[in-house]
Design a protein with these regions (language model features):
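Short, glycine-/small-residue-rich phosphate/pyrophosphate-handling segment
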Residues: 92, 105-151
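Active-site rim beta-loop-alpha module in soluble metabolic enzymes
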Residues: 155-156
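N-terminal beta1-alpha1-beta2 submodule of the flavodoxin-like/Rossmannoid cofactor-binding fold
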Residues: 1-106, 150, 159-186
Length: 186
């Protein structure tokens, strides 16, 4: 079983990356193969909105999004990980979500059987961010509601997530729940 985390934070040592690592570490300890893709380390251009993808099997832009989306297709479980920036997902995560437009145009869905969401905010807008991610999940995955696992909370400065033990535990629990869910329905 393979679980892939896609991280929308540009901070490699920030709170959200730390929590993604916690979830993946727990999943790995339970036997899952894990991978983490930090979007800021790749070239993922924004959607150009030209609608040409309706005529093709994938986006015509030649950047790293195609490779990342292929990894997404192969995963049994996916974790969407983002900080809240200006009341919603980060720009990196938004660009990635928008590049999935071709799925909608071709009435396709990813095969992942479980999805996790990790969101960290400084002080507010977690609900708005969750709404955006759930909308993406609804359009892009054929996953039942009880197979979507969420860990979210608050952390202001770099390193604050490590001190927020309930949030760390929630991230680890998310990794565990994903593995258990994949095992029980395989």
């Amino acid at each position: 079983m393979k679980i892939l985390a896609v991280v929308g934070s540009p901070r490699l040592k920030g709170n959200i990356n730390y929590l993604a690592d916690q979830a993946l570490e727990e999943a790995q300890e339970l036997g899952a193969e894990t991978e983490k893709i930090v979007l800021s380390q790749y070239e993922v251009n924004p959607c150009l909105g030209h609608d040409d993808c309706a005529s093709f099997e994938s986006c015509l832009q030649k950047d790293d999004a195609g490779w990342i989306l292929d990894r997404f297709r192969e995963a049994d479980g996916v974790i969407l990980v983002t900080p809240v920036y200006w009341y919603n997902v980060s720009a990196q995560m938004k660009a990635f979500i928008d590049r999935n437009y071709f799925l909608y145009k071709h009435d396709q869905k990813y095969k992942a059987r479980v999805v996790g969401i990790i969101v960290v905010a400084e002080m507010e807008a977690i609900e708005d961010t969750l709404h955006t991610l759930k909308q993406f999940i609804d359009w892009s995955f054929d996953v039942e509601e009880d197979r979507i696992f969420i860990a979210c909370g608050y952390a202001h400065k770099m390193g604050d997530a490590k001190k927020n033990l309930p949030l760390v535990e929630d991230a680890r629990k998310l990794g565990k729940q994903m593995v258990e869910s994949l095992r029980e329905r395989s």
